[in-house]
UniProtKB/Swiss-Prot annotation:
Name of this protein: Ribosome biogenesis protein BOP1 homolog
GO biological process: one example: maturation of LSU-rRNA from tricistronic rRNA transcript (SSU-rRNA, 5.8S rRNA, LSU-rRNA)
Major subcellular site: nucleus
Species of origin: Leishmania braziliensis
The UniProt record lists the keyword Metal-binding: no
Family: Belongs to the WD repeat BOP1/ERB1 family.
Domain of life: Eukaryota
Pfam families assigned to the protein according to its UniProt record, in alphabetical order: BOP1NT, WD40
Length: 743
């Protein structure tokens, strides 16, 4: 149907047959030649082979080929008189006019009643070929050419019946030879290749089931009401309301970067001025690949087929893919945020005083690296262990050197016994643990009790006399425990155990009483170990001690428990394969913390089982410190991180602080956290960082960690220790400097 026209008859396909009969009747009455307007297929076939009709005079002529067109070719009749534009004509259904002409005058409707229209359709012989033009409110009669055009369009034919689309096609002169055809020799694909595979069949079946399911669901959905046609604005600018996502998608999109067009130097026959000279070629060859501006030098070829393969094709395509992958797809508003607002609000460090902030003392005399420092329980004396084989004890307040103990080998660690009822200074020296009683550091009764505590069980008669003699000796300030009642002849035959002998090291650790020479030096008891002692720690009561030998070839003997009062030695872990780095006893509960290279294990000493395992994220753990309350602990590692673990929070670090630039070698909590909630970390970058770490009793509050001070040294820091009752910090460095930092 032509646009803008409506047919008077709606009989469908049968209407054209009636129209065909009427036109034939009209043609007979006028005496014209036999013309078939709508020929059937048989008639067209007969006309093609030249068969005449029954009377021999019939002929088949297509509509439009013999009809003489009397219509005028002027375009004035076809001009659009109604100039209302492309609007719905329903807007004028209640008006007396149908629109306006080019001069703005109204075009009035033709008023005809239904009876008049019926009579016109009955009396008019051309009623079957008459259509109504709603735009101009008039009837138009279709010519034979128009009917033939409609007839051709309905059957998907060309609009011009005389047009032959195959007139320019030449006749195929190629003769098919089955014997020489490739497919005739069974070399083509078999029928099996056209059968879909089993997995393809399953995929298709799955898609069919999905479509059927969607169709069934769509039938169950309630039918949506069709919206009425909304009024349209005649002079709208085409603005479309969009949501934020759609507007961002279409208006903030950034086009992908285009490949730059090739330059003249990339031509296969560039001008002579673009060709490089020999000097330029040598300079290009000397440059590195990443420093070259281009990956090739211009060359001249006689023809394009002489151009070789571009060796940098794959790299260029890869770089192009990277450019497309990493190019921003849309414009985004950059958020300008003040970096200070991202930091948590912390109290002013000045409000958290006291804490160590100034250098007050230098404890001189060391000639090598000081690997360990320890403060006595009363805070009066400071012990240091140095690589020059000496253990020195200083008075904290004055810096006076009270005593030096020659151990004969580098000292790995020194530590005072935390119990105030025992006056013991222990030192780790290669394959042994050495116990010294500094008599000047405690009362005589405490010294006597300490000697009996270390030597009481399993002594022979001569050893009891020696112990009694040691107990009767007056202890003077600045002097070590000596045995003056024994003569040189009585001490000459005493056997000494060589701790460096291979056979002796293979034995279990055993307690050994000091020889006369060692007693003169102040050594009371030694414990021979099977491997080099790296670290050790005391229990809070001073009776138990744990020693670590990480380089022992027997893995379960890396951790050794010692009971000093009964001289018992036992290995608590029989099936243990990890390398240990540090250990600590819980200050209040029967728990034992053992740090390995990548975790911290918490053992219950009463139940003899592993209670918890804390994952230390990062590098290899180096040191461990337990909070005096026992619910938190610190772990240092080789990645410059200090991890704060909350046992009530999680098995993972509560805070992970990276304040240093080197390996964290030492860290320690202040023993008196109720008055001084402080902890310090020392690293190989020569800095000691002091933190305020407040732990609350309320479980709804997290621990508060605030950095308050940075204490700088010239060399790596190996040890840190707090004063037991003051906010003083003692540090030791690689160059043998031992300092005291006070508030």
């Amino acid at each position: 149907m032509l646009p803008g026209y409506t047919a008077e008859s709606k009989d469908g396909a049968h209407g054209y047959e009636r129209l065909h009969d009427i036109i034939l009747q009209d043609s007979d009455a006028d005496g014209e030649d036999d013309v078939i307007l709508f020929p059937h297929a048989e008639e067209l076939a007969n006309a093609a082979v030249g068969i005449d009709g029954d009377d021999g005079n019939g002929r088949v002529v297509r509509l439009g080929t013999t009809q003489h067109l009397d219509e005028s070719d002027s375009s004035e009749d076809e001009a659009t008189l109604n100039r209302v534009g492309d609007i719905p004509l329903e807007w004028y259904k209640d008006e007396k006019h149908i629109g306006y002409d080019i001069e703005g005058k109204k075009l009035m409707k033709a008023e005809r009643s239904a009876l008049e229209r019926l009579l016109e359709a009955t009396d008019d012989p051309n009623a079957m070929r008459t259509i109504y033009d709603a735009l101009h409110d008039e009837k138009k009669t279709l010519s034979n050419a128009d009917l033939q055009l409609i007839f051709n369009l309905q059957r998907n034919r060309t609009t011009n019946s005389n047009y032959d689309m195959y007139s320019g096609v030449q006749e195929d002169t190629v003769v098919f030879d089955p014997l020489n055809h490739p497919l005739a020799r069974s070399s083509g694909p078999s029928k099996k290749a056209f059968v879909p595979a089993l997995h393809d069949t399953k995929v298709i079946a799955k898609m069919v089931r999905r479509l059927r399911k969607e169709e069934a669901e769509s039938k169950l959905r309630p039918a949506t009401e069709e919206k009425e046609d909304e009024d349209q604005l005649l002079w709208d600018d085409g603005h479309v309301e969009m949501d934020t996502h759609t507007h961002f998608k279409y208006f903030n999109r950034v086009p992908k970067p285009k490949v730059p067009p090739p330059g003249t130097f990339e031509s296969y026959r560039p001008p002579p001025e673009y060709l490089p000279s020999e000097r330029a070629k040598q300079r290009q060859a000397r440059l590195r690949t990443i420093d070259r501006r281009e990956h090739f030098l211009p060359q001249s070829f006689d023809a394009l087929r002489h151009v070789p393969f571009y060796h940098h094709t794959i790299q260029d395509r890869y770089q192009r893919c990277l450019d497309l992958a990493f190019f921003p797809r849309a414009q985004r508003t950059r958020l300008v945020v003040d970096p200070d607002k991202l930091l948590p609000e912390l109290p002013n460090p000045k409000d958290l005083r006291p804490y160590p902030e100034k250098l007050s003392f230098h404890y001189k005399g060391h000639t090598a690296t000081v690997r360990s420092v320890s403060v006595s329980p009363n805070g009066q004396y400071l012990a240091t262990g140095c690589d020059d084989h000496l253990v020195r004890v200083y008075e904290v307040q004055t810096g006076r050197l009270m005593k030096r103990y020659d151990m004969g080998a580098p000292v790995q660690q020194v530590e005072f016994c935390p119990s105030k009822s025992l006056n013991i200074l222990a030192a780790a020296v290669e394959y042994s643990l050495v116990f010294v009683v500094p008599t000047f550091a405690a009362h005589a009764l405490v010294n006597d009790h300490t000697i009996r505590f270390l030597r009481a069980p399993g002594l022979s008669a001569g050893q009891r006399e020696a112990a009694h003699a040691l107990g009767a000796v007056d202890t003077l300030g600045g002097r070590a425990v000596t045995q003056t009642t024994l003569d040189a002849d009585e001490t000459a035959h005493e056997a000494t155990t060589d701790l460096h002998d291979v056979e002796e090291r293979e034995k279990r650790a055993e307690f050994l009483d000091a020889s006369a020479k060692e007693r003169n030096a102040g050594i009371v008891v030694k414990i021979a170990m099977h491997a080099k002692v790296k670290k050790f720690c005391f229990h809070i009561k001073g009776d138990y001690l744990c020693a670590l030998c990480p380089k022992d070839h027997v893995k379960y003997r890396q951790t050794i428990m010692l009971q000093l009062s009964k001289r018992k030695v036992f290995c608590p872990f029989r099936k243990f394969s990890e390398v240990v780095t540090d250990c600590r006893f819980h200050p209040r509960e029967p728990l034992f913390f053992l740090a390995t290279t990548n975790s911290v294990r918490c053992y219950n000493l009463m139940a003899h089982r592993l209670q918890r395992r804390f994952k230390a994220s990062g590098g290899v753990t180096t040191c461990l410190s337990i909070h005096p309350e026992g619910d938190n602990f610190l772990v240092g590692d080789t990645t410059s991180h200090t991890s704060w673990f909350d046992m009530d929070f999680s098995d993972k670090p509560y805070k992970r602080m990276r304040s240093h630039k080197g390996v964290v070698n030492a860290l320690a909590f202040h023993p008196k956290t109720g008055a001084y909630p402080l902890f310090a970390t020392g690293a190989s970058d020569g800095q000691v960082h002091v933190f305020h770490g407040m732990v609350y009793d309320d479980y709804n509050k997290n621990a508060l960690v605030v950095p308050v001070k940075i204490l700088k040294h010239q060399r790596s820091v190996y040890a840190v220790a707090w004063h037991p009752s003051l906010a003083w910090l003692f540090t030791s460095t690689e160059d043998g400097v031992v300092t005291a930092w006070t508030e």
